[in-house]
C-alpha cells in the first residue's frame, strides 16, 4: 500500500530532491553520489520552536560554537540542494536568462499583434499591468518557498506538500503539457519565420536544423547550457532596448517619413476596440489570457533551484530581477506598439498562424516607419527568440518530469541523472515529443497546434494560483505550528495578503476567460468550438484531479496544517546567529545611500 504523502512520515523519508528513499534508483545512486543521510525529521528539530515572533512560547537561546559557524559556511551547498544529483552550476545571471529565455518569445514579438487587434492599445497596457501585479506576488511567494526549500522542480513539489497530492498532480501535469506543446510549436514558428526570406524550401528542412541544434544544446552540461541561453537572452534584451529607442524616435517623428505620431492611434481608431462599452470590455477581458501566456516561463527561476550554486541567495535575487526585467520590457514595448501600429491594421491578422512573424507588431511598426533593412533584422531577432524559447522548453519540461517522477506522479526512470548532472531520460522523452514539429509542412499544422495548445492553454494561470496558494498554506502552517518567520532565508515582500490578492485576481481572469471563450468577440452567440479552444485545459484539469483521487483512493481535500512537514529539505538555522546577522545587515544598509537601499529592497 503506497504511503500517504499527507503525513509528515512520508516527507521524512524523502531525500535527493524529495525522492523516496525506498526507490530502486536511490540505492543505485547511493554508490556514485555523496549525500546527506541525516534528515531533519530523523534528528532533533532543525529549528527551535521558540521565538519573539511566536507569542505564548518561552524564548530559548542556543549556544553558538565555532564548529556551528564552520558547518554553516562550509556545508551550505550540500544542505541547500539536499543532494540532488543534478549539476549545481547555475548562478544568478543564468537563472535570470533562463527565465528571460522562456518568457520573451512569440508572446511578445508575435502574439501581441492579435491582442492589439482584439482589444486595442489601452487593453494591452491595462491587461499586462494587471497581470504584472499578480506576477509580482507570485514571484515573491516563489522566492520565499524556493529559498526555504531549494529542491528539484520547485513549485511542482510545493503544491503537493502544502496543498494536496491530487491537486498537485493535475496542475503539474497541465504545466508539463504546456512545455511539451511549446517545443514543437516554437520549432514550427522558427520554420515559418524563415519564409520571410525564402518560402521555396520545405519547412521541415528548417525544422530538422533547429531541432538538431536544440537537441545538441541540451546534451551539454548544465553550465554550458546556461551560457548558451545567456547569449541568446542577451540578444533579445539588446533588441528590446534597441526597439525602445527606435520606437521613441519614430513616435516623435524622427523616422524617414517624418511627422509626429504620439498618441494619434489612441484617438483614431481608438484606445479600445468596439463600438459599445460592452464590446470594448469583452475585448479587454479577451486579452488577459494572452497576457498571462506571454509571461509564462518567469517561474523558471524556481524550476532551476536545485541546479543553482547558492539557491537561498540566488533564487530571490533572480526572481525579483527577472520580474522587473521582463515586466519593464513588456510594458514599454506594448506602449510603443500602441503608438506606432493602429489596432485596425490588417497585417496584424495576416499571419498564416498564431506564430507567424509576418503579423508581428514590431516588424509592422518598423515597416510603417519606412526604415529599410530593419524589418529583416527584426525578423532575425524573432527567429533567435523562438529558438531560445524552444531551448528553454526542453530544459523546463525535462526538469518538471524529474520533479514529478521524484514525487511519484511519473515513472521513476524519468528521475535518473547521469554523471554530468543531466536528466537524460527526461530530455530524450521531451525531444521525442518535439518530433511533432515535423507537421510544419502540412496544411493542417495550424489546426493541429490550435488543439494541442488548447490542452494546456490556462496552465500558466493554474500554476501561478497554485504557487500563491502554496505560500498561503505554508504561512498558515507556520502559524499553527507556532514557528518563527526568522527561520526563513527570504520573506515575501507582499506577504500573505499579496498572495491572496494574486490568487483572487487570477481567479477572476479565469472567469473572464470562460466568458470570452463561450461567447467569443464578434460572435452571434455561444460557440462550443471557441469554448474548447480557449478553455479545454480546465475540464482536463478536473479529469486529472478526479482520476488521481480515484486511483489513490485518497479523499482528503487538503493537507492538515498541523501535519504539514516544515522541516525536511531545509538547512539547520541557528536563530540567535541569524538575528545577529540580520541586525548587522540592517545597520550596514542604513548607512548606505537611498539608491542602494532602494535597489536592495526591490532587486
From Swiss-Prot:
High-affinity permease for histidine. It is a multi-pass membrane protein. Residues 1-95, 143-165, 224-236, 298-321, 397-423, 473-491, 550-603 are cytoplasmic. Residues 66-75 have a biased composition (Basic and acidic residues). The modification Phosphothreonine is found at residue 76. GO terms for biological process: amino acid transmembrane transport; histidine transport; manganese ion transport. GO terms for cellular component: cell periphery; endoplasmic reticulum; membrane; plasma membrane. Present with 688 molecules/cell in log phase SD medium. This is Histidine permease. Keywords: Amino-acid transport, Membrane, Phosphoprotein, Transmembrane, Transmembrane helix, Transport. Residues 117-121, 186-203, 256-279, 343-376, 443-451, 511-530 are extracellular. The keyword Iron does not apply. GO terms for molecular function: amino acid transmembrane transporter activity; high-affinity L-histidine transmembrane transporter activity. InterPro entries: AA-permease/SLC12A_dom, Amino_acid_permease_CS, Amino_acid_permease_fungi, APC_YAT.
Amino acid at each position: 500500500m503506497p504511503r500517504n504523502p499527507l503525513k509528515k512520515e512520508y516527507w521524512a523519508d524523502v531525500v535527493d530532491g524529495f525522492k523516496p528513499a525506498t526507490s530502486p534508483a536511490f540505492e543505485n545512486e547511493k554508490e556514485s553520489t555523496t549525500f546527506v543521510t541525516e534528515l531533519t525529521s530523523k534528528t532533533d528539530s532543525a529549528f527551535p520552536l521558540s521565538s519573539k515572533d511566536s507569542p505564548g512560547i518561552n524564548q530559548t537561546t542556543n549556544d553558538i560554537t565555532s564548529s556551528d559557524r564552520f558547518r554553516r559556511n562550509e556545508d551550505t551547498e550540500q544542505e541547500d540542494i539536499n543532494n540532488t544529483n543534478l549539476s549545481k552550476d547555475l548562478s544568478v545571471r543564468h537563472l535570470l536568462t533562463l527565465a528571460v529565455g522562456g518568457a520573451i518569445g512569440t508572446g511578445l514579438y508575435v502574439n501581441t499583434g492579435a491582442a492589439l487587434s482584439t482589444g486595442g492599445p489601452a487593453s494591452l497596457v491595462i491587461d499586462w499591468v494587471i497581470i504584472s501585479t499578480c506576477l509580482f506576488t507570485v514571484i515573491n511567494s516563489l522566492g520565499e518557498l524556493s529559498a526555504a526549500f531549494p529542491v528539484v522542480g520547485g513549485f511542482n513539489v510545493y503544491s503537493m506538500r502544502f496543498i494536496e497530492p491530487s491537486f498537485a498532480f493535475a496542475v503539474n501535469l497541465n504545466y508539463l503539457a504546456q512545455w511539451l506543446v511549446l517545443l514543437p510549436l516554437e520549432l514550427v514558428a522558427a520554420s515559418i519565420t524563415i519564409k520571410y526570406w525564402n518560402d521555396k524550401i520545405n519547412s521541415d528542412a528548417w525544422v530538422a536544423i533547429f531541432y538538431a541544434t536544440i537537441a545538441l544544446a541540451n546534451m551539454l552540461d548544465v553550465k554550458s547550457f546556461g551560457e548558451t541561453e545567456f547569449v541568446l537572452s542577451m540578444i533579445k534584451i539588446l533588441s528590446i532596448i534597441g526597439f525602445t529607442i527606435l520606437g521613441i524616435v519614430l513616435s516623435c517623428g524622427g523616422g524617414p517619413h517624418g511627422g509626429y505620431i504620439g498618441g494619434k492611434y489612441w484617438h483614431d481608431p481608438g484606445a479600445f476596440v468596439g463600438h459599445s462599452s460592452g464590446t470594448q470590455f469583452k475585448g479587454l477581458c479577451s486579452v488577459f489570457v494572452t497576457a498571462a501566456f506571454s509571461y509564462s516561463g518567469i517561474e523558471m527561476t524556481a524550476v532551476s533551484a536545485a541546479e543553482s550554486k547558492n539557491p537561498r541567495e540566488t533564487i530571490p535575487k533572480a526572481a525579483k530581477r527577472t520580474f522587473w526585467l521582463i515586466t519593464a520590457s513588456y510594458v514599454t514595448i506594448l506602449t510603443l506598439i500602441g503608438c506606432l501600429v493602429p489596432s485596425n491594421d490588417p497585417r496584424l491578422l495576416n499571419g498564416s498562424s498564431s506564430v507567424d512573424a509576418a503579423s508581428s507588431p514590431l516588424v509592422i511598426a518598423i515597416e510603417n516607419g519606412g526604415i529599410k533593412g530593419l524589418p529583416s533584422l527584426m525578423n532575425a531577432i524573432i527567429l533567435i527568440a523562438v529558438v531560445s524559447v524552444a531551448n528553454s522548453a526542453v530544459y523546463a519540461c525535462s526538469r518538471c518530469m524529474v520533479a514529478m517522477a521524484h514525487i511519484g506522479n511519473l515513472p521513476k526512470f524519468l528521475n535518473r541523472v547521469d554523471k554530468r548532472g543531466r536528466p537524460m531520460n527526461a530530455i530524450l522523452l521531451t525531444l521525442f515529443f518535439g518530433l511533432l514539429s515535423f507537421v510544419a509542412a502540412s496544411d493542417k499544422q495550424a489546426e493541429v497546434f490550435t488543439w494541442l495548445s488548447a490542452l494546456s492553454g490556462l496552465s500558466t494561470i493554474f500554476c501561478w494560483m497554485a504557487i500563491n496558494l502554496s505560500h498561503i498554506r505554508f504561512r498558515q502552517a507556520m502559524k499553527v505550528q507556532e514557528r518563527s518567520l526568522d527561520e526563513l532565508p527570504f520573506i515575501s515582500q507582499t506577504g500573505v495578503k499579496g498572495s491572496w490578492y494574486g490568487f483572487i485576481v487570477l481567479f477572476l481572469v479565469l472567469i473572464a476567460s470562460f466568458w470570452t471563450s463561450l461567447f467569443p468577440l464578434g460572435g452571434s452567440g455561444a460557440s462550443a468550438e471557441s469554448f474548447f479552444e480557449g478553455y479545454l485545459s480546465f475540464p482536463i484539469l478536473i479529469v486529472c484531479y478526479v482520476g488521481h483521487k480515484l486511483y489513490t483512493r485518497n479523499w482528503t481535500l487538503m493537507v492538515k496544517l498541523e501535519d504539514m512537514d516544515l522541516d525536511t529539505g531545509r538547512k539547520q538555522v541557528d536563530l540567535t546567529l541569524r538575528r545577529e546577522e540580520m541586525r548587522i545587515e540592517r545597520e550596514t544598509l542604513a548607512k548606505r545611500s537611498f539608491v542602494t537601499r532602494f535597489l536592495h529592497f526591490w532587486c
